[in-house]
């Protein structure tokens, strides 16, 4: 049997005080092959569970004596050993990775009993790869909607709604870099290529003070490290896309790289099948991920991460003399360089320089009319984070962050024959900064507290010009210009964060948290998902920062030696300065965009249940959310509260994975949710506009009659998906391995509405909602390989 880990024990020094033995400081460093640091490794010391930090490091203070220690991590073999602690000790543990495609599905979850952090969950790619997905394309953002408290906008939507928040209120990060548009194909898929991703973590409440800038959640996606010892590759070929990844050492044992690419071939297949009809029309998207790291020495590491991806949609119609062309290109570019330093066993820091950009370009021609539009957002960021652990009773974290924003709110031009209209919407600029400090304190053996304070600052500056608004909020028709660096509107807010953990007997605990968050950037959209025509706008004199406050309390219980995990969380959240648009608002090429906005408040509350089986041939979980979310705007619904469009009273997810035998594994997912709320007319009536003076005949128009906003519910959404994973040679020691994944999406062919439109019967003067459906039953097959 090969060794699953190697362990080196080094006794550094001992202290004695009088006749009494002093507690010993025990430092544990967990690594993989090539000295790769394993973050989030689970360490059990006499059944007390801890986790390593981002550098694979853990320090605890233990009374002298004999201890049984178990170390485990996702995709690595676990390691158990006993050790006598009679002095300060350093433990270096190297875990051996698992290589097979099959294996028990395990959720890497921080919702355990002993962790002070609540409302946090994470999933690894090994699990997501086995679950059934639409068209065989793995999508981490869709997978996390199977967890309680996280919803999508409906069939095929990637807009995420966490505990009553909007799609722009989630801080989506790739290796710590913000992503402003995480969607492909108008929201059908996300930009995260499963071949390049290691895990995804979601924080729904009790947000730590080192995160900010969004109201609702943090969605932290981590890409994979490369292999420092040997060259390896992996990939997959599916129905609509293929992906390939290559990794290996740059300097063996010290430096590695990982390069991954994905592209759809919807356009290529369509041209082969129907070339005469398709012509140059088509759509595709691609992603490229790159990551490299370099261990300068045991205490210093450099990390570089990069992503670029675009969607390209083309349409042309020249039949019957028509000249119609439509070409839209949109995408993200991200890059970051990070320096990680372990100054001592107690002090470490990470400093990063980050660049990110989202851009949209559209060129359209309709006969003699041409239209061009471009928008985007570009950031340059620098940040530093520090962590100090004094002993087992106290841990401090602090840091600083600065971001320079450049907004391109939608410049363009319209040409009609010889006439041309050029939109002169100026770019906007802003400075955003924040500092934070947080401390973890063990008050008593049973009571732990995490208290933090984040202080955020935002300043919209010139050069730009803006419309002047009167006291009534309406435009005066005048503009005001600002010089470079001149302040237009500045805001600063304290954001306190505090959470408690109280341990109960028999592997149970109670947790509570309070969080205040501020958001200075807003997504200008009248749609539910983040479509590429949406515009990011900064807070200013008229647009105030959005603020949210959330309280949460939960009960957590582990059973049968941590094989089962149960939890229940209740939350209540208020939101101020929420944005909606007036009916019929024009977003594109609008110099008075702020004048189209109205401002209000929101409230969300609910309770989430989660039950999980983590080990054995059968694994899985059940998640259920009972919730309510409302919005209140003085200028909408007569000032009365109304149901938020994506309110979902009941939301249920059942996920199961069963190992049939050594070669076959089965997974199934069932989801059920209350239908989205929407506004439909109750009837239709004629309205007399007066007389036509030319022939003295009355002029009538027809008007739809509405009772209230979002007083209608779409039918309940429910669906069953299944998938099978087949590995021909699961225990093969050969370098090359492969597996097949077969899936069926929407097994019983449920007709879930994608949207509802209004059909008008002009003769009977009636209106009726017509449902449009998107996905019927869809089979898929994907071949995965690695070498």
Give the ranges of each region predicted by the language model.
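A beta-strand signature from Gram-negative outer-membrane beta-barrel systems
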Residues: 93, 146-147, 191-230, 234, ...
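Periplasmic N-terminal accessory/gating domains of Gram-negative outer-membrane beta-barrel systems
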Residues: 108, 113-168, 173-207, 224-225
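Flexible loop and strand-edge segments within Gram-negative outer membrane beta-barrel domains
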Residues: 281, 299-381, 421-428, 531-532
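Short, acidic, small-residue-rich periplasmic hinge/interaction motif at the N-terminus
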Residues: 31-36, 42, 72-76, 86-134, ...
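C-terminal beta-signal and adjacent terminal beta-strands/loops
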Residues: 663, 672-700, 715-721, 725-787
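Gram-negative outer-membrane beta-barrel transporters
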Residues: 571-574, 593-680
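Outer membrane beta-barrel strand-and-loop segments of large Gram-negative receptors
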Residues: 379-385, 424, 432-434, 538-544, ...
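Surface-exposed extracellular loop regions of Gram-negative outer-membrane beta-barrel proteins
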Residues: 359, 406-417, 421, 459-477, ...
């Amino acid at each position: 049997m090969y060794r699953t880990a190697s362990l080196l024990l080094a006794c550094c020094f001992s202290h004695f005080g009088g006749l009494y033995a002093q507690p010993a400081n025990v430092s544990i460093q967990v690594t993989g092959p090539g000295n790769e640091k394993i973050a989030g490794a689970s360490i059990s010391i006499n059944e007390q569970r801890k986790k390593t930090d981002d550098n694979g490091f853990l320090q605890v203070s233990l009374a002298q004596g004999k201890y049984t220690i178990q170390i485990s991590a996702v995709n690595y073999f676990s390691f158990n050993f006993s050790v006598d602690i009679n002095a300060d000790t350093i433990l270096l543990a190297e875990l051996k990775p698992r290589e097979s495609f099959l294996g028990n599905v395990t959720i890497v979850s921080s919702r355990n009993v002993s962790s002070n952090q609540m409302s946090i969950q994470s999933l690894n790619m090994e699990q997501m790869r086995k679950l059934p997905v639409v068209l065989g394309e793995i999508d981490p953002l869709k997978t996390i909607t199977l967890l309680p408290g996280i919803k999508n906008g409906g069939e095929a939507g990637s807009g995420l709604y966490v505990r009553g928040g909007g799609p722009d209120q989630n801080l989506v990060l790739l290796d710590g870099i913000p992503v402003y548009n995480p969607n492909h194909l108008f929201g059908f898929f996300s930009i995260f290529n499963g071949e390049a991703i290691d895990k995804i973590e979601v924080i729904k409440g009790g947000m730590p003070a080192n995160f900010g800038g969004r109201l609702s959640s943090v969605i932290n996606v981590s890409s994979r490290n490369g292999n420092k010892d040997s060259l390896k590759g992996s990939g997959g070929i599916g129905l609509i896309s293929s992906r390939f990844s290559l990794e290996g050492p740059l300097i063996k044992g010290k430096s590695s790289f990982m390069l991954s690419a994905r592209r759809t071939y919807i356009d290529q297949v369509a041209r082969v099948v129907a070339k005469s009809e398709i012509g140059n029309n088509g759509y595709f998207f691609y992603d490229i991920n790159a990551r490299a790291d370099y261990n300068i020495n045991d205490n210093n590491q450099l990390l570089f991460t990069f992503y670029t991806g675009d969607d390209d949609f083309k349409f042309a119609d020249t039949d019957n003399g028509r000249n119609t062309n439509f070409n839209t290109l949109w995408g993200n570019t991200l890059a970051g360089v990070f320096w990680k330093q372990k100054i001592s066993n107690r002090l470490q820091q990470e400093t990063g320089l980050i660049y990110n950009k989202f851009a949209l370009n559209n060129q359209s021609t309709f006969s003699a009319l041409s239209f061009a539009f471009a928008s985007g957002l570009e950031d340059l960021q620098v940040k530093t984070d520090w962590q100090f652990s004094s002993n087992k009773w106290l841990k401090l974290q602090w840091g600083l962050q600065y971001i320079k924003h450049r907004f391109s709110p939608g410049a363009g031009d319209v040409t009609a024959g010889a006439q041309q209209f050029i939109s002169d919407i100026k770019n906007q600029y802003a400075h955003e900064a924040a500092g934070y400090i947080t401390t973890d304190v063990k008050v008593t053996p049973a009571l732990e507290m995490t208290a933090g304070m984040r202080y955020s600052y935002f300043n919209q500056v010139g050069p730009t010009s803006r419309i002047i608004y009167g006291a009534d909020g309406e435009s005066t028709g005048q503009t005001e210009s600002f010089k470079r660096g001149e302040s237009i509107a500045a805001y600063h807010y304290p954001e306190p964060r505090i959470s408690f953990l109280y341990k109960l007997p028999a592997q149970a605990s109670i947790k509570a948290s309070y969080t205040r968050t501020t958001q200075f950037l807003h997504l200008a959209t009248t749609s539910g998902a983040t479509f590429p025509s949406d515009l990011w706008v900064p807070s200013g004199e008229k647009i105030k920062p959005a603020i949210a406050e959330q309280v949460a309390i939960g009960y957590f219980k582990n059973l049968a030696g941590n094989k089962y995990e149960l939890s229940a969380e209740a939350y209540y959240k208020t939101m101020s300065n929420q944005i909606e648009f007036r009916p019929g608002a024009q977003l594109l090429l609008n110099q008075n965009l702020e004048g189209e906005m109205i401002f209000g408040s929101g409230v969300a509350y609910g309770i989430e249940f989660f039950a999980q089986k983590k080990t054995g041939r059968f694994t899985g979980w059940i998640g259920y959310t009972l919730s309510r979310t409302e919005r209140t705007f003085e200028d909408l619904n007569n000032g009365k509260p109304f149901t938020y469009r994506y309110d979902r009273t009941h939301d249920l997810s059942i996920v199961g994975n069963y190992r049939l035998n050594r070669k076959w594994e089965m997974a199934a997912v069932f989801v059920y949710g209350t239908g989205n709320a929407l506004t439909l007319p109750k009837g239709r009536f004629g309205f007399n506009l007066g007389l036509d003076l030319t022939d003295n005949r009355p002029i009538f128009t027809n008007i739809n009659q509405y009772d209230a906003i979002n007083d209608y519910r779409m039918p309940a959404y429910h669906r069953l998906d299944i998938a099978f994973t087949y590995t021909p040679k699961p225990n093969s020691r050969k370098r090359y391995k492969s597996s097949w994944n077969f899936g069926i999406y929407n097994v019983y062919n449920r007709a879930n509405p994608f949207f509802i439109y209004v059909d008008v019967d002009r003769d009977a003067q009636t209106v009726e909602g017509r449902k449009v459906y998107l996905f019927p039953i869809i089979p898929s097959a994907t071949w995965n390989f690695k070498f």
